[in-house]
């Protein structure tokens, strides 16, 4: 139906070859346009890559999440939008691999999910950010970290926080935002999380963000997918206030209506 009205079809996710072929045929039938936003695999000659990490002089803001569905991507866009409205030339390296259609937003590099040695992913990501710094000359770089920072449980390990380990070893952040689930959590949990980030990743959490989804804790120790439920604004504010009171206002904790107060 879109093609009949001269609309573009944007391909931003990997699909089966048969589905892709059908899509191409439809585009040709209606003289439409298929725009492939997916990054192609690159042939990398490791012998030409200096096995070193470069210093990054541009301020780096990292946005990580305790797990999936913590609104990391929306938070990345919101922080970018706020900084741009303040007049800063801001670039975002997204936690997603299909963000090429957004202004000044780079997708997660394809090599991060490729079959190359893990140590080279760290080196290549560092070189990727360095090249961006030199060519784009941004005033701020926002980096979104995909996935979780550690396994949710032994039954639901996710990707074991591999991307977090690789990216935080590739580039040291100047400011780190940790996105949490909208569950009732204790001050002890927050303090222990800060210790984990400090000693496992050599990174300090500067503030926390409460996402819009709560995790169904009864589903994290089963083999079926973890379930989540949306929480309303009133409950989110109450969670935030309860946690701040328990922590005696030592930590900065924000919700989506308070993005401009981050930091």
Positions of predicted regions on the chain:
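Extreme N-terminal, non-catalytic leader segments
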Residues: 4-60
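Flexible, glycine/proline-enriched loop segments at strand-loop-helix junctions
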Residues: 10-14, 63-70, 115-118
């Amino acid at each position: 139906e879109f093609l009949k009205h001269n609309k573009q079809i944007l391909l931003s996710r990997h699909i089966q070859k048969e589905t892709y072929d059908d899509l191409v045929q439809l585009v040709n039938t209606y003289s439409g346009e298929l725009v492939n936003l997916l990054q192609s695999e690159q042939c990398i000659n490791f012998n030409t890559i200096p096995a070193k990490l470069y210093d990054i002089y541009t301020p780096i803001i990292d946005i990580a999440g305790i797990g999936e569905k913590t609104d990391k991507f929306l938070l990345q866009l919101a922080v970018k939008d706020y900084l741009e409205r303040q007049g800063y030339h801001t670039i975002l390296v997204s936690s997603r691999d299909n963000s090429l259609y957004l202004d000044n937003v780079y997708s997660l590099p394809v090599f991060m999910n490729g079959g190359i040695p893990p140590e080279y992913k760290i080196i290549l990501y560092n070189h990727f950010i360095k090249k961006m710094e030199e060519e784009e000359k941004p005033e701020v770089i926002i980096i979104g970290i995909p996935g979780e920072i550690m396994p949710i449980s032994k039954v639901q390990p996710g990707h074991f926080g591999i991307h977090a380990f690789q990216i935080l070893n590739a580039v040291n952040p100047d400011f780190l935002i940790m996105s949490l689930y909208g569950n009732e959590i204790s001050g002890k949990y927050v303090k222990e999380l800060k210790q984990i980030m400090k000693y496992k990743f050599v990174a300090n959490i500067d503030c926390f963000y409460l996402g819009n989804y709560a995790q169904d804790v009864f589903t994290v120790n089963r083999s079926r997918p973890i379930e989540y439920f949306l929480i309303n604004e009133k409950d989110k504010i109450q969670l935030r206030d309860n946690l701040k009171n328990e922590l005696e206002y030592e930590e900065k904790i924000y919700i989506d209506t308070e993005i401009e107060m981050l930091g």
